[in-house]
Amino acid sequence: MSSIPLHLVTGFLGSGKTTFLKNYLEEFSGSRKIGIIQNEFSNVNVDSFELQQNKSGFEILEVNNGSVFCVCLLGSSVDSLDSFINQVQPDELVMEASGMSDPLSIGQILQSPKLKHKVYLDHVWCLVDAVNFKKITRLQTRVNHQIRIADTLIINKTDLAEDENDELVYLIKKLNPFAGIQLATFARVSFDLNKPVMKLWPSKENVENGRPDLESQVIKSNRLISANNLNEFLKVIQSGCIRSKGYINLTSGAKVLLQGIFDQFTLQEVEKFVAPTEFVVIGSFPEAQSYQKLFDNCCSK
């Protein structure tokens, strides 16, 4: 089985993720077999019932209680997803994350032995509620984190906040200047994945012999790293790296957003990021190579 692309759909509660999924299915489910993974935080999954009313060309795996993104249930989530892929054999996967989820945790799932050769993260969509964004972003730092790692940001419900749309675009660009931004009503957008400034993956046409054999490693640390040592770390990983993204705390006190495609890396200082270092590196790695250990060693120099 070829490696399957996974599209991750994030956004706070009520931002329009399920409506976006409906639109996505209307666009593509007639031409490809789509596996839908819903990561609901409640015990009863209402959204999957809503989606199934228009079922055509897709299957649903209900993952309740936020289990896909919960480290304590990581094993069972991997088994469920692996079984789902084997049974359904979809052309692609679309995961709707719960509104309370931290999207980077998906990297821990995809790097599991059962999945790392079957699934790769293709694109991260984040829906932003134009009406309630200012209230939510003050209360939930996780919302800002969802915005920061997105490839495409969809500012939804713009018809209900017309006077604030320009300001919202400005505020969101401050959080993530690299993502493509689309203004939408009822989550209707263009699905042209070539529009984002920093697309998560190279286009299929640029990959020889089909999709690459890719893995992902999530690096986490409570320690600080100097700018010089970080540059040395990036030089080491660049040969096997296709995509890197996340946040790093420096010894200078600065917090930087790492964005990388192949051997090209950018580091941008960010404000209001209060969390340990956490970033994902995706690519083809030598066996048993641990970027976590390498990063830890660079922190201790």
Predicted regions and their residues:
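Flexible loop/N-cap segments at domain edges
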Residues: 281
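C-terminal accessory "lid"/substrate-recognition subdomains
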Residues: 2, 43, 145-275, 285-289, ...
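Nucleotide-state-sensitive switch-loop elements of NTP-binding domains
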Residues: 2-10, 15-136
